[in-house]
Amino acid sequence: MSIPRSRQENISLQPRDLSILRTLFECRVFTTTHAASLFFNGRKEAAKKRLQILKRAGLIAERPRAPSEPAVLYLTRKGLETLRDAGILNEYPAFDLPTLLRRAQVGNSTIRHELEVMDVKVAFHEAVRAQSQLSIPRFSTWPLLHSFTVSHPKSKGAKVLVLPDGYFEIHESAPVHETKIHRFFLEVDRSTESLETLVSRSAGYLAHYRSGGFAIGQGGDRRAFRAFPIRVLIVVSSPHRRDNLAKALIAATPPIYSITWIATREDLLKNPLGPIWKLPIESGSGADRSTHPLVA
């Protein structure tokens, strides 16, 4: 794949630059801190310098903000055209450029949510980077890319569209055994949603898994769905909401025991792989306070 030159300023784009543009294409917005962690090994000054070059080239731009707020970056039309010229947009669903530009025009509440999703993505990347046997080959935060329709238990046979906040995989290597793939869907709770909504979404994921729909999407056979286990990670605002959600999942019909794992935002940002995750199956039992590591 040839790397195009910027048409606004005479710069040579590096592969890392295209990775930055691709990530902005998927997630719509991120901050300099996010970019520093994902692309510059935490070196914020290096990130600032390169992002300034991309801004001067007209490939990315900054949303209006108050002086006390962090800069929030987004992909410009020239950035989209650069991805198109590099052939990268061919890897995604086909949309015209005006549609893709409108996708970046979102309100402040949506921006806050998407930045919270990026906080989660960065936390996982930093935690995995510290463990040599782990890697994250894919972490997508564009809901459309991993959406699915499923016959929901409460929809009386009607198909329901589920749009995850994210999907990612952690690959765990070992000297003797084959690489183990941990697959996760991500939901970052906005706290404005009812517990019933979160339970309903969890039921949709469970139906998608048990029906073999996810296995088919992974290139497997519907009948061999157990060969493609998934976990749904729900990130909530407080221990109180975490515990109430766990109890609501157990009380659902049918009960949701273990496909959904729940953690608070505060715990996740500190140690996403650690023993912070609560399983509904343990709610209300003697192990009510038990939590588990994500990758044992």
Model-predicted segments: where are they?
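Electrostatic, structured charged patches in enzyme active sites and in nucleic-acid/phosphate-binding
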Residues: M1-L18, R84, I88-A296
